[in-house]
């Protein structure tokens, strides 16, 4: 009953090694990020010559923990770390929804992938940038309490 589906899944994730076909086998990988946080600035739309426009905004995620002994764990000091993420939205439908409805302070859920790139700054110095490229889903819970889900 489950034999065929199990074999299909197994074949997708296991790389078959052989001398003849080893260069022909493509193995699957996964690059997926899910973030839930607050928008740090209103989105901006940018367009580079010859390329499609992109909507860009920053997103803050927080990590909180208590310090102290395990016996009095609830009595310890609360610490918090905020991490800022650069979100880029390239998909035409989702890009426009993000530009129109995402505002500073809104609570956002973003699903996408991590991208590492390089660029030259205005002083001609090579810089590295980490960007989250929004995929198919962007859920906006605005400051006013309204919710909007954008799917592309």
Curated annotation (Swiss-Prot):
InterPro entries: NA-bd_OB-fold, Primosome_PriB/ssb, ssDNA-bd. It is found in: Mitochondrion; Mitochondrion matrix, Mitochondrion nucleoid. Pfam families: SSB. The modification Phosphoserine is found at residues 67, 79. One of its GO terms (cellular component) is mitochondrial nucleoid. Expressed in all the layers of the retina (at protein level). This is Single-stranded DNA-binding protein, mitochondrial. GO terms for biological process: DNA replication; mitochondrion organization; positive regulation of mitochondrial DNA replication; protein homotetramerization. Its main location: mitochondrion. Keywords: Acetylation, DNA replication, DNA-binding, Mitochondrion, Mitochondrion nucleoid, Phosphoprotein, Transit peptide. Homotetramer. Interacts with MPG/AAG, through inhibition of its glycosylase activity it potentially prevents formation of DNA breaks in ssDNA, ensuring that base removal primarily occurs in dsDNA. Interacts with POLDIP2. Interacts with PRIMPOL. It comes from Mus musculus (Mouse). The keyword Nucleus does not apply. Binds preferentially and cooperatively to pyrimidine rich single-stranded DNA (ss-DNA). In vitro, required to maintain the copy number of mitochondrial DNA (mtDNA) and plays a crucial role during mtDNA replication by stimulating the activity of the replisome components POLG and TWNK at the replication fork. Promotes the activity of the gamma complex polymerase POLG, largely by organizing the template DNA and eliminating secondary structures to favor ss-DNA conformations that facilitate POLG activity. In addition it is able to promote the 5'-3' unwinding activity of the mtDNA helicase TWNK. Residues 30-141 form the SSB domain. GO terms for molecular function: chromatin binding; single-stranded DNA binding. The gene is Ssbp1. The keyword Plastid does not apply. Residues 1-16 form a transit peptide. The modification N6-acetyllysine is found at residue 113. The modification N6-succinyllysine is found at residue 122.
